[in-house]
Amino acid sequence: MATGNEIAATLHELVDRDFTFMHICGTHEAAIARTGLRSLLPERLKIVMGPGCPVCITPQGEIDAALDLADKDCIVTTYGDLLRVPGSKGSLESSGGDVRVVQGVHKAVEIARKTGKEVVFISVGFETTAPTVAATILTKPPENFSILSCHRIVPPAMKWLLEQGEAKLDGFMLPGHVCTVTGYEDYEQFPVPQVVAGFEPDDILLGLLMLVRQVREGTHRVDNAYPRAVTREGNVKAKKVMYEVFESCDVEWRGFPVIPGSGLRLKKEFEQYDAQKKFSIVFRHISKHSACICDRVLRGIAQPSDCRLFSKICHPRTPVGPCMVSHEGACKIWHMYQTKKSDMPLP
């Protein structure tokens, strides 16, 4: 197999026009920034981050709903990344309620078994985390347990991006983690070059090379540069469990309008575990902070350093937008490495 430097050299030979590809995975962005991979790429080849951070795309209205639950004297449980994401009324960290960080939904269920209080798990994530939540629901947790489903599905967001065309994309690098569960069959509907890529620098470079070759050939398909972990069908059992418990629904993404079929909600037979129904919670649209450009970063039409708040008013200790909170957020990643083109060598 060719080394990273050899693949980069081939890219320099083949890239004879402007290419812009989008990845939809915060782990890809972290790997690219950490290794300085962009410094190996031709000037005319750009790789931009899209809505690949599940915490970042959770809209303020859903954060406000979680805050409402904390005000209702519920024990609110969630992943650590979500604690500092600002809603319109503050964050879970500053709410003053009983908010607990857990490693997963099973830990939230354990808490529910040991208390008489209502326990709500704020359930965020793409198709990677939803099957585990679904499997937990199937175990029939105690009656004082429920989830606030903030799950999202990737393909409908890609469809929206392609239809809008504002990012002027030549292709997509598909999220490796998501595709281990879903496979890539659903992505074959899109008439654009795509590749599933892993997370090592060589994986990402190989994915870019495959995308460039598709564009030069004037064709489109889904190539798999990550066959050691991803198959076309994905994890059939995990998908079956997920759709046994959840059904798709229309939801808003932060930085996006309501995208049809892009969310997951509990089916009617499991609604006793649906915190929205249990506590009459309504997700409201909240206008964004006027100076924050997280919305543009998530749509691939701006980069973190374009924001006048970046690493000044907005930094991990005092985040203005969610992209500076999550370890998968582009702004936090760029803040950590503080460069557009790192001079760090490729491993």
Language model regions located:
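Metallocofactor- and cofactor-centric catalytic cores in central/energy metabolism, strongly enriched
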Residues: 1-116, 130, 140-142, 148, ...
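Short amphipathic alpha-helical segments
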Residues: 34-35, 90, 133-135, 185, ...
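Hydrophobic alpha-helical scaffolding
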Residues: 56, 122, 126, 194-201, ...
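Short, surface-exposed amphipathic charged segments that create phosphate/polyanion-binding patches used
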Residues: 62-65, 113-119, 160-166, 187-188, ...
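Conserved structured core elements
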Residues: 106, 126-130, 151-152, 198, ...
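Phosphate/pyrophosphate-binding betaalpha-module
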Residues: 122, 126-185
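A conserved active-site cap/scaffold subdomain adjacent to cofactor or substrate pockets
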Residues: 148, 165-230
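Internal helical hairpin/lid segments
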Residues: 206-296
